[in-house]
Structures are given as C-alpha cells and as structure tokens.
A protein has these predicted regions:
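Walker B catalytic acidic pair
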Residues: 93
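Active-site-proximal or metal-binding-adjacent scaffold patches in catalytic folds
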Residues: 1-88, 97-127
Length: 127
C-alpha cells in the first residue's frame, strides 16, 4: 500500500484536523486528477481518433466516470487507483460517446482497445 503523510502547520493542530485533512486531501486528489485525467484523455483521443466536446473533473457520489451528451465527467477519486485503471475508466467513457448502452457494439469496441476489459470491469465493480 502507498502511504501519504500530511503535515499541518502548528496553528491547525488544535483545530478540527479531520475536516482540514479532508479538504487538503480533496484538493490534492483534484490536482493529481487534473494531470492524470488529461494524460488519459489525450492518450485515448489519439488511440480512438475522436474526443468529447468537453470533459470535467468533478466529485461524484458513487461513480468514477460518466458520459452524458458528448461530455465526460471523471471523479478526482480516480487517482486512488493505478494508471491502468484510470486509462480503462476513461476508455470506458469514450466508448459511451459512440454507444450509450453496453450493447454488443459497445463491448466489441471496448474489447478492441482493451482486450483485458473484463479484468478492469471486475475491479471497478468491487470498488
């Protein structure tokens, strides 16, 4: 497991540390997500030859990714996982730009670009 150590300035040590840590970790995830999601989006754009009209990184309650109306939304929580998982989630959402449901054509496209998609599906389902 990876360990992240956060040191707070002395003036915050007696305050509500849990809330401060939640905010700090959230901001850290957002900053890392911006870099990692941008990397994965560009990689997938080059691989597939198309891109969404827009994408955003926004905290979501349960989902790590979503595709609606030619826009992909990715949760900053995605950075808790390996790059392979991030790449898979972005690819998964890209495939939804072409196919809204998990129809046979969608699965065929997903499998074409990620032959091990079932491994990642199982992993994401257990998050």
């Amino acid at each position: 497991d990876k360990i992240i150590k956060i040191s707070l300035p002395n003036k915050y040590k007696k305050a509500n540390n849990e809330r401060i840590l939640d905010i700090a970790i959230g901001k850290m995830y957002e900053q890392i997500a911006k870099v990692e999601v941008e990397r994965a989006m560009e990689k997938t754009r080059i691989l597939l030859g198309f891109a969404p009209e827009d994408y955003e990184i926004r905290k979501m309650n349960e989902e790590l990714g979503r595709c609606e109306e030619n826009k992909i939304t990715i949760s900053p929580e995605i950075v808790k996982y390996d790059r392979e998982v991030i790449d898979y989630i972005v690819l998964h959402e890209y495939c939804h730009l072409k196919y809204k449901s998990h129809c046979k054509s969608y699965i065929k496209m997903l499998e074409k670009y990620e032959p091990n998609y079932k491994k990642y599906e199982r992993f994401v389902a257990n998050i």
